Amino acid sequence: MDNETSTPDIFQWCVSPFSKITLKRSMEQRDIVEFRIDATILRQIFHHGFPDLSFNLMVITTDRKVFLLERTESFHYPRVVERIKRGQECTKLVETLYQAERDAVRRLTAEADIVPLAAVKQDDDRPESIYIFPGGHCNGNEPVLSTLLREFREETTIPLKTTELRFHATKVYGIWIHDFAVGKTFKNFVFPVKINLSSAAIRDRFRETRHTRNPTFVDIGKSHRQSLLDLVIKVQKIMIL
C-alpha cells in the first residue's frame, strides 16, 4: 500500500515508538502508535511546520469528555462525483459514502448506468456518522501550534488561546489510517490536550461550518486506572470506518 506522506524530520525528535495497537474494520485499518516525548521535543514540534502531515487535537474537557466533530460530507464524496463526471467506475468509493450521498449518486447515474450502484448495500456495518478530531494540515511552513489553533477555530468557530490549553508533555500519538477504498495510508499526529472549557460550553459556542457539525462528546469516566493509550483506543474505535 502506498504512503500518502513521506517520513518527515519530526521522527528525529521522537523516541522510538513505545507501543503500537492495530484496529481494523471494513473500510480502514488504523495503527495507533504511542510516542514518548518530553517538553523540549513538544516545543520543537510546535515551532516547525510539516505540510505533508495532519495534526489533530484530542481535546479533553473539564467534565472529562473527549470532543469530536462530525463531518458534513464523507471523505470520498467529492472524488466519487468527479469520477462519475468522467465516466469512471467507483463502486468501492460509493460504499464509503453517507446514505444521503449514495442516494444523490444513484440519481446522478440513474440514466447513464455508470456505476453498478444496485450492488451497494444500504444496511452495511459502517457508521451513520464520520467523526474527526479538530485539526488539519499546515499551510506551508506554518508552525504546528498555529495550525492546531487555526484549524480548531475554523472547524468550531471557537477561538482558543494557548493559555487555555494544557498539552500532555510526555506522549503524542501517531494514527496511521490505511484507507482500503483508495489504497493509501494517511499519517496523523494527535496531541492530547486538556481545555479549560466544559462540554456544555463548547456545545453552546459551537457553530456549524461547511465541513463540520454536531459536536459530539465521548465520556472517558473518572477512573485513574485507564491509561492515556486506553482512552485513545476507546475514541478511535468510534472513529474508525
Curated annotation (Swiss-Prot):
A Pfam family recorded for this sequence: NUDIX
Motif Nudix box mapped to chain: 136-157
Top-level taxon of origin: Viruses
Keyword Magnesium: yes
Gene Ontology molecular-function annotations: hydrolase activity; metal ion binding
Keyword Lipid biosynthesis tagged: no
UniProtKB keywords: Hydrolase, Magnesium, Manganese, Metal-binding
Binding positions for Mg(2+) per the UniProt entry: 151, 155, 204
Enzyme Commission code: 3.6.1.-
Similarity section: Belongs to the Nudix hydrolase family.
Name the record gives this protein: Putative hydrolase 080R
Source organism of the structure: Invertebrate iridescent virus 3
